[in-house]
Amino acid sequence: MFPMVTEFINYGQQTVRAARYIGQGFMITLSHANRLPVTIQYPYEKLITSERFRGRIHFEFDKCIACEVCVRVCPIDLPVVDWKLETDIRKKRLLNYSIDFGICIFCGNCVEYCPTNCLSMTEEYELSTYDRHELNYNQIALGRLPMSIIDDYTIRTILNLPEIKT
């Protein structure tokens, strides 16, 4: 008779434990139910990127001294720097500079180690094209500043995202 009572007690304890676990999961689900949605309607709404966002690289041709530091620090040797040595002044003259954003991993090493600060990261992240060869930007394309999301009147920017309470 006692084994039957202990089995009944164990069964009751297991039932209470299972109900508690189910209740904990249900409480977590309910705590997520009252949060605001995180999804945005992308083409019409855009998030304003943070100050340290690593987007498309901007290049200033006049500042570059063709030292090729950007090529040396790049993990994939990506920037293509063509230069010519001017014998009369014994300095390098930059002829062409290009970066293929189809290969770039946006690590930011080239921007960080550039001695003349001719490279900078922009907030532009919409680089998709139908042809991957269009992602190879030369110094003219790299020199264009992107249109700021804030200045575009057709897009509603989302400044303050709801904070996630933990």
Swiss-Prot record:
Principal cellular location given in the protein's record: plastid
Protein name as annotated: NAD(P)H-quinone oxidoreductase subunit I, chloroplastic
HAMAP family the record matches: NDH1_NuoI
Organism per entry: Laphamia lindheimeri
Residues binding [4Fe-4S] cluster 1, per UniProt: C64, C67, C70, C114
Catalytic activity, EC: 7.1.1.-
EC class (word): translocase
Cellular location(s): Plastid, Chloroplast thylakoid membrane
